Design a protein with these regions (language model features):
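Residue-level marker for well-ordered alpha-helical positions
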Residues: 30, 40, 60, 70, ...
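Immediate flanking context of iron-sulfur cluster ligation sites
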Residues: 26-34, 57-67, 191-195
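Glycine-rich loop at the start of a catalytic domain that most often binds anionic cofactors/ligands
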Residues: 66-71, 158
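Iron-sulfur-associated redox domains of electron-transfer enzymes in respiratory
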Residues: 85-265
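Iron-sulfur cluster-binding cysteine motifs and their immediate structural context
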Residues: 18-19, 37, 41-61, 71-92
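Alpha-helical architecture
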Residues: 38, 68, 199-200
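Ferredoxin-type iron-sulfur electron-transfer modules and their immediate structural context
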Residues: 2-45, 49-52
Length: 265
C-alpha cells in the first residue's frame, strides 16, 4: 500500500510517502497531518482495533494488530472533497447551481414542542427532538451523539444514547474536536439500527464508508447533519480552567454555552 502515512511512534506532524509494503506504519489517505479532520473514521472502521487516538485526537497505529486491509484509507475524508460525486451518491444527481448549498427540497424554521428540549438546545432543540422521535418510535435503537465526560467534565466525548435522559445530556454546543466516527465500532459490536448527529467532515467519512463497507454503513439508518464553523483543539477547556485558576478536580460540570437559547458563553 503506497501513499502518505502517519508514523505510529513519533507523534509529529511528519508524513511518510512511498511506503514500502512491509513498512511498520500506517498508510492513511491524507497527504499531510494538517488535513486530518480528526473525525475518527479510521479508528472506527478498523475491524482489528488497530488504530487509537492520541491526546489531540490524531490517529496512531498499533502495528501488531494491523492487517493492512486498507479500510482506514478508504474512509478517510481528509484528502479531498468531491461535491458533485457526493451529491450524486446521496441524491442521484449532481448539484445544478454548482454552489455549496447542495440539494435543497424545502427550508423550514421550527423548534421542539418539548419545553425541556427547546430550552436546553443550542437553537430550539430540533435535532434532539428529531432524534428522540426516532428512538421513541423504534425507528432506531440508539443515537450517536456527544456529551462532557462524567469523570473529566472538561473533556467532550462521543457516546451512544439510548434513553431520553441521555439525549438531554447530549444537548448544546461543544466547541471542541470530537472524533464522532470512532463510534462506528458500535455498529460492529451491537445489533440494531442507529442514528447519528454529525458534522460535515464526519458525514463525509460516513459517505466514504457507504462505498467501502455498505453492509456496515447500512446499520446507520439516519444521519442528521449539523452546521460547523470550525472546531477548537481538545485542550481548550483545560486551558480555560488554567487561565481562571480553577483546579480540574473542583469542576463538577462544564458548559461552553449555558442558559436558555441563545445562551451565554
Amino acid at each position: 500500500m503506497n501513499g502518505p502515512a502517519v508514523h505510529p511512534e513519533s507523534g509529529t506532524d511528519r508524513t511518510m510517502t512511498a511506503i514500502p509494503p512491509d513498512a511498520p506504519f500506517l498508510s492513511i489517505g491524507f497527504s499531510a497531518r494538517e488535513l486530518c479532520t480528526r473525525c475518527g473514521s479510521c479508528a472506527g472502521v478498523c475491524p482489528e482495533d488497530a488504530i487509537e487516538l492520541d491526546e489531540r485526537k490524531f490517529p496512531r497505529l498499533i502495528p501488531d494488530r494491523c492487517t493492512r486491509c486498507g479500510l482506514c484509507e478508504a474512509v478517510c475524508p481528509g484528502a479531498e472533497v468531491r461535491f458533485g460525486e457526493l451529491s450524486e451518491q446521496v441524491f442521484g444527481r449532481r448539484n445544478g447551481g454548482g454552489g455549496f448549498d447542495g440539494q435543497v427540497a424545502k427550508t423550514y424554521v421550527g423548534y421542539s414542542t418539548d419545553d425541556r428540549l427547546r430550552s436546553g438546545g443550542a437553537g430550539g432543540g430540533m435535532v434532539t427532538a428529531l432524534l428522540w422521535h426516532l428512538l421513541r418510535t423504534g425507528e432506531v435503537d440508539g443515537v450517536l451523539v456527544t456529551r462532557m465526560n462524567r469523570e473529566r467534565p472538561w473533556e467532550a466525548e462521543p457516546f451512544l444514547a439510548t434513553t431520553y435522559e441521555e439525549l438531554v445530556a447530549s444537548q448544546g454546543s461543544r466547541y471542541a474536536i470530537i472524533p464522532m466516527n470512532v463510534l462506528w465500532r458500535e455498529l460492529r459490536r451491537r445489533p440494531g439500527k442507529l442514528a447519528a448527529a454529525i458534522l460535515p467532515c464526519q458525514t463525509h467519512g460516513f459517505r466514504r464508508l457507504q462505498k467501502a463497507d455498505p453492509e456496515l454503513a447500512g446499520r446507520l439508518t439516519a444521519v442528521v447533519g449539523l452546521f460547523c464553523g470550525g472546531s477548537l483543539e481538545p485542550v481548550l477547556a483545560r486551558e480555560m480552567l488554567a487561565v481562571r485558576g480553577i483546579r480540574r478536580g473542583a469542576v463538577a460540570d462544564f458548559k461552553f454555552r449555558g442558559g436558555d437559547w441563545p445562551g451565554q458563553m
